[in-house]
């Protein structure tokens, strides 16, 4: 009985790490694919979801309907032009996924990282992310420099 519980605990831990890593991979992939769509004048204020879907830029594991891209937690992912850069917003993230995503992608390469209502410029540390990811339905937005 103890052995079964230990195996189940390890399986859950492995699944949780895989799940969180996948969210980082998905958002990182969308950032890279959107950078490939940059016009000479930047991104304007356009919604890039449909362009990413039509270009086949979404990983096969990512669901979408029309121009709405869904994340693994039931929230949505939006990619919208922000002048010379663009913003990727990921909604309804658990505390764990919020912290992991913000810490992994909230780097000095971003113009800003917004977690719920708090904005950060530069690197987002684990401590900063932990203080900002306060619910089980967090929103993280990354705005690129270009």
Feature-to-residue mapping (PLM):
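N-terminal single-pass transmembrane signal-anchor helix
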Residues: 1-19, 23
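N-terminal alpha-helical signal peptides/signal-anchor transmembrane segments
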Residues: 11-15, 27-45
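Outer-membrane beta-barrel proteins
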Residues: 18, 22-31, 146
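Periplasmic/extracellular, small/polar-rich flexible segments of pilin-like filament-forming proteins
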Residues: 39-146
């Amino acid at each position: 009985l103890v052995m079964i519980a230990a195996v189940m605990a390890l399986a859950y831990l492995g699944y949780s790490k895989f799940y969180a890593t996948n969210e980082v991979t998905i958002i990182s992939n969308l950032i890279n694919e959107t950078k490939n769509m940059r016009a000479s004048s930047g991104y304007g204020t356009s919604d890039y979801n449909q362009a990413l879907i039509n270009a086949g830029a979404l990983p096969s594991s990512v669901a979408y309907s029309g121009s709405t891209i869904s994340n693994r937690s039931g929230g949505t992912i939006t990619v919208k032009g922000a002048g010379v850069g663009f913003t990727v917003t990921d909604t309804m993230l658990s505390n764990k996924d919020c912290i992991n995503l913000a810490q992994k992608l909230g780097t000095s390469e971003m113009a800003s990282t917004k977690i719920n209502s708090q904005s950060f410029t530069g690197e987002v540390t684990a401590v900063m992310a932990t203080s900002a990811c306060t619910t089980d339905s967090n929103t993280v937005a990354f705005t690129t420099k270009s």
